[in-house]
Structures are given as structure tokens and as C-alpha cells.
Amino acid sequence: MAHTRGISGLVGKLVMETEVNCNADKYYQIYKHHEDLPSAIPHIVTSAKAVEGHGTTSGCVKEWGYMHEGKTLTCKEKTTYNDETRTICHSISEGDLMNDYKKFDATLVVDPKDNGHGSIVKYILDYEKINEDSPVPIHYLALCNQATEDLNTYLCASV
């Protein structure tokens, strides 16, 4: 896990990489086909639906429900996909995150491991805090890590 801050202290980036046992395409596809996430990791993702466009097409808008620190929270975001690089970018525009951040982008990149067994899952959180009192979103990176590990368990069990 790495953290870098922008010059102003308001802008920053958090990066996390986790090794998983599952195939990179399988891991990427469950995130792309987001409707399966609430049944795969219901203790983290409580709902996921496309509200504009087709949910697997770049430019679609999705609404998410998720659990964080014992609370049910929501967000609305625009999603872009790059199937070739197995990259998904969520640009959050509405919801609970916007109470602390002017900008919040969560990028997921899934790469196959060089040995052909398993994958590397990378989350990149780019953010701009509303003010100095807004927290660095390390707790959201921890949530991403938990989702990665739990989804790995789910996907490997369903093989």
C-alpha cells in the first residue's frame, strides 16, 4: 500500500496491490458485470445497478450501495472500461463520498501474474478533499482490500 500527496495537501492518490489466486479475466469480468457483486460480497456491496446506459459499456452511470464502518452508504458514478488492459475507472459524482471530497476516482486494474497463476489486483484512489479537515481516504483503500480478498475467496470457491 502506498500513499502520495499533492502539493496542496488537498489532492492525493492512494495505491494498493493485492495478489489473488483467480484468473485475471474472471476477476475483471465480475466487476464489469457488477450485478453479481451484491450476491458475491453482500457484506460490502449491498446494491449495484446501471441507471444510465448499459452497465457494461463505457460512459454508463451506476448507483451503488455499500457497507462501510457499519453504515450503509451510496454513491453514483460514471464508469469507463478498457477490456484490453482490464481497467475500470469509477468517477464518483454523487453520494456520501462527496461530503468529504470534491473529486473521487477509483480505478481497478487486474493483471495476470507472470507465471500464469493468479492475478495482481490494483486499486488507485485519486481524490481532492473539500478542505484540510477531510480525511485521507485510507479507510476506503482498506475497504477495497477487503473486497479484493473476499471476492477472491468467492471466485475461487465457485470454480
Swiss-Prot record:
Tissue specificity, per the record, is:
Laticifer.
Is-annotated flag, keyword Transferase? no
Q: Please provide the record's keywords in A-Z order.
A: Cytoplasmic vesicle, Vacuole
Subcellular location(s) per record: Vacuole; Cytoplasmic vesicle
- Alphabetized SMART domains for the sequence: Bet_v_1
InterPro entries per the record? Bet_v_I/MLP, MLP-like, START-like_dom_sf
Pfam family of the protein (one): Bet_v_1
A single Gene Ontology biological process assigned to it is: defense response
This entry carries the following GO cellular component terms, namely: cytoplasmic vesicle; vacuole
Q: Which family does it belong to?
A: Belongs to the MLP family.
What the protein does comes down to: Not known; MLPs constitute up to 50% of the soluble latex protein.
Protein name listed in UniProt: Major latex protein 149
Q: What is the lineage of its organism?
A: Eukaryota, Viridiplantae, Streptophyta, Embryophyta, Tracheophyta
